[in-house]
Amino acid sequence: MEVEILETCKKELRTFPEEILEDFLDAVAKLKDGISLSMPLSRKMPSIGPLVAELRFRDRAGIYRVIYFIKKRDAIYMVHAFSKKTQKTPKKNLDLASKRIRRL
């Protein structure tokens, strides 16, 4: 499966620690190989859309998320990457991911 990382998402990923980026690249490789990911690495996000999920990473410094969208079962788009301090995903991050998905 093809994986596309939006330019805005690439910029956001550059703020992640190196260890988290390595974990992210491992997860992307699995998705490319067609491996279905589940908790705790990936969680569906029906509040944004039926084919939307997030990659979940954590280290001592914080919590990191990358929201992605599966389009027509032949491409995956990484649309938004961010760190957060609380368990709940901030509404502004959900809204931004939703906006980027609508543009695809």
Please tell me what each predicted stretch does.
Residues 1-63, 72-75, 85-104:
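Basic, Lys/Arg-enriched alpha-helical interface segments
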Residues 66:
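Portal/gating segments that form or line small-molecule/metal binding sites
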Residues 79:
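Conserved catalytic cores of phosphodiester-cleaving nucleases, focusing on short active-site segments
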Residues 69:
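Conserved Hanks-type protein kinase catalytic core
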Residues 82:
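Compact, Lys/Arg-rich rRNA/RNP-binding cores from ribosome-related proteins
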